[in-house]
Amino acid sequence: VKAHLQKRGLEVKDCGCYSTESCDYPVFGHAAAQAVADGECEKGIVICTTGIGISISANKVKGIRCALCSDSLSAKMTRLHNNANMLAMGAGIVGTNLALDIVDTFLDTEFSGEERHQRRINLIEQ
């Protein structure tokens, strides 16, 4: 994913992890989410085995709307309707080609800006 983002000409901040050893993914999910919440990064992408734990960790940070996506339609809809600012994926769930398609869809889809969706986002953030 990192190489794919760089090929797209995007600047990447890698918050880890840097090995294939078992790690405490909440540390990395929180670091990525904090970078987005602080405005250091526009969007964030986090990955763990299922994507579940790291998405939960990211969503603990105020202002983060991290969506776990295993298909491109979910990635599109979470941007259109939820204005998600982070994407979580499971490395053990989606293959490389699908993951890259999900990433592209997530990054290339803009928030619809519809009042009903913004109203719901406001309710979530209360």
How should each PLM-predicted stretch be described?
Residues 1-3, 56-60, 100:
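Short amphipathic alpha-helical segments
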Residues 46-92:
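Mid-chain, well-packed structural core segment of small domains
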Residues 10-23:
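A short beta-strand-loop structural module common to alpha/beta enzyme folds
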Residues 28-50:
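Short, structured active-site "lid" loops
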Residues 1-12:
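Glycine-rich phosphate/diphosphate-binding loop of Rossmann-like nucleotide-binding domains
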Residues 7, 72-126:
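C-terminal binding/interaction regions
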